[in-house]
Swiss-Prot record:
Signal peptide from the UniProt entry: 1-24
Gene3D superfamilies, sorted: Porin
A Gene Ontology biological process term: monoatomic ion transport
SUPFAM superfamilies from the UniProt entry: Porins
Domain of life: Bacteria
Membership in a protein family: Belongs to the OprO/OprP family.
Chain segments annotated as coiled-coil in the UniProt record: none
Taxonomic placement: Bacteria, Pseudomonadati, Pseudomonadota, Gammaproteobacteria, Pseudomonadales
InterPro entries: Porin_dom_sf, Porin_O/P
Compartment list: Cell outer membrane
Organism: Pseudomonas aeruginosa (strain ATCC 15692 / DSM 22644 / CIP 104116 / JCM 14847 / LMG 12228 / 1C / PRS 101 / PAO1)
Protein name per Swiss-Prot or TrEMBL: Porin O
Length: 438
């Protein structure tokens, strides 16, 4: 029933956006005049900028094929699914209050109990340049996470984030954040979140995030960006899932919503267990570094993170992990990646030629390592010692226009001390995406 009503809402919203084409322009009222824009969704705003309303969305349809380590038996499997299907509603109220609601119809974010919200937040901007944000949103950690999923270069973000997926996902929690730009060359943010998990007393897990970026050059085609990140969560007396289970660039092995490889998908556990009991671990912390440089159509970026899950019982050992990625991208048609200092992030590539669009090629190298000394005996798929993985990502993006993007990427993964059921320690995958945003 919920899905039926959701689809009805989407159809109505799209019909409203289309019908509004006939009314685009300025409407005179007995109060402030209203400006209606229909390029890229439906946007309505008063001329005094006191109020605004924008209806938009994003649709990402993916298809992937993969084999080797990516499947349990090593044979080829595939997956066709909506990676994201967002309806987005945002705007301004009384000039200084901003709101944003993103609902995921593909059910890849959120949950049935808490709603499939990618974001539901309110931001107060009256202390310019300081912003205060409240609600459900992803904590701020990392350049690639700060960049919208619409405009990240590869179909999936880097594998290093999967070493500690809690650092920049809301996990059905609520949070508060303060952020600001400084002297037209820096960005700072700090936040606290109450996650959906509770300790033995029913007190929610608290998480703290900090991100600082220095970007003295921050224009399209002229970017210099360096930053540091820190995330911490208190796990005292908390039972939780401590598994580290990277997908290594192939979402299709196990999607949160939609078709995947089913029981044959191999989302292997590199460290941790599914049911770490209360009292086993005290806290969890992650440090991160990020850097980027762009000149004209060329861009390079890299990130590094190190995690320590600290044991609180002599029966358990600390779990440590570290990882990094390095990425190069070049737009063959000459366009530059856009960049925004507010949020310290890359943005879209805007095609200059409306007939051929913009063509971008990229390469990314991912490398991760997990040290879990709680593993003291070999199993059929995991040896004692540090598990490792590396992945090569080679792909192309075609920005057909401002709304449509088509992507294709080949991923080659190699692991150490961990295999699938067939003994494979490498795998190949190919993923394509059709994206439409409005």
């Amino acid at each position: 029933m919920i899905r039926k009503h959701s689809l009805g809402f989407v159809a109505s919203a799209l019909a409203l956006a289309v019908s509004a084409q006939a009314f685009a322009g300025t409407v005179t009222t007995d109060g402030a005049d209203i400006v209606i824009k229909t390029k890229g969704g439906l946007e309505v705003a008063t001329t005094d900028k006191e109020f605004s309303f924008k209806l938009g969305g994003r649709l990402q349809a993916d298809y992937s094929r993969f084999d080797g380590f990516y499947t349990k038996n090593g044979n080829t499997a595939d997956a066709a699914y909506f990676r994201r299907a967002f309806i987005e509603l945002g705007g301004t109220a009384y000039k200084d209050w901003k709101y944003q609601i993103n609902f995921d119809l593909s059910h890849n974010t959120g949950s049935s109990d808490n709603g499939y919200f990618d974001e539901a937040s309110v931001t107060y901007t009256g202390f310019n340049p300081v912003n205060l944000k409240f609600g459900r949103f992803d904590p701020d950690f990392g350049l690639e996470k700060a960049t919208s999923s619409k405009w990240v270069t590869a179909p999936e973000r880097n594998a290093a984030y999967e070493l500690a997926d809690w650092i920049n996902t809301h996990q059905d929690g609520m949070g508060a954040q303060v952020n600001s730009t400084l002297a037209d060359m820096a960005y700072l943010s700090a936040g606290v979140s109450a996650k959906d998990a509770d300790d033995s007393d029913g007190d929610s897990v608290k998480q703290f995030n900090f991100r600082g970026v220095f970007a003295p050059m921050h224009e399209a085609g002229n970017v210099l960006h360096v930053g540091v990140n820190y995330a911490y969560r208190d796990l005292d007396d908390t039972a939780f899932d401590s598994r580290i289970r990277p997908r290594l660039g192939m979402r299709g092995i196990a999607t949160s919503g939609g078709n995947d490889a089913g029981d044959n998908g191999n989302r292997a556990t590199f460290g941790g267990v599914s049911n770490s009991p209360a009292g086993s671990y005290k806290d969890d912390s992650v440090w991160g570094l990020e850097g980027a440089w762009a000149m004209g159509p060329f861009s390079a970026q890299a990130e590094y993170l190190a995690r320590k899950l600290k044991a609180d019982d002599n029966a358990y050992k600390d779990i440590k992990a570290k990882g990094y990625y390095a990425q190069l991208a070049y737009t063959l048609t000459g366009e530059s990646r856009q960049y925004k200092l507010e949020g310290a992030k890359f943005d879209s590539v805007k095609p200059e030629n409306k007939e051929i669009g913009a063509w971008e090629v990229f390469y990314r190298y991912d490398n991760i390592k997990v040290e879990d000394d709680n593993v003291v005996a070999d199993t059929a798929t995991r040896e004692v010692g540090d598990t490792k993985a590396k992945a090569h990502n080679l792909g192309v993006n075609w920005y057909v226009n401002d709304a449509v993007k088509i992507s294709a990427a080949y991923v080659k993964a190699k692991t150490d001390k961990i295999t699938n059921n067939n003994g494979d320690d490498d795998g190949d995958g190919f993923v394509t995406r059709l994206q439409y945003v409005f």
